[in-house]
């Protein structure tokens, strides 16, 4: 969701670009680390299942956050990256990808108000 907004990317980009899917996966792995610290068991197979789901989506499909970006609407980034960062701090897990995504999205949202 967040990566698609920052990249302006439809599902096709994640289906075809190793760089885009790698960035998405890096954000997901931060969530997995936090989940494990909280006693929630997420595994590599969960990421594999996400890729299987993603591969079946329409290449022209867009995440809700990308649609928000295109309409210059405030996003739900605080519910995504903001919460990941908060929980990362709680469990002493670094979240550099989600931190970067939050900063970029908040900066873009600020720019829309100018």
Language model features with spans:
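NAD(P)-dependent Rossmann-like dehydrogenase/reductase catalytic/cofactor-binding core
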Residues: 21-114
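Anionic-ligand binding region
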Residues: 1-26
């Amino acid at each position: 969701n967040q990566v698609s907004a920052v990249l302006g990317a439809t599902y096709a980009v994640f289906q075809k670009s190793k760089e885009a899917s790698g960035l998405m996966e890096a954000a997901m792995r931060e969530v997995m680390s936090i989940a494990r610290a909280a006693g929630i068991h997420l595994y590599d197979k969960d990421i594999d299942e996400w890729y299987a789901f993603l591969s079946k989506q329409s290449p022209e499909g867009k995440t809700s956050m990308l649609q928000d970006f295109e309409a210059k609407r405030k996003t739900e980034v605080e519910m995504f990256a903001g919460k990941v960062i908060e929980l990362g701090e709680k469990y002493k897990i670094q979240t550099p990808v989600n931190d970067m995504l939050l900063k970029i999205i908040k900066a873009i949202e600020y720019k829309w108000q100018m």
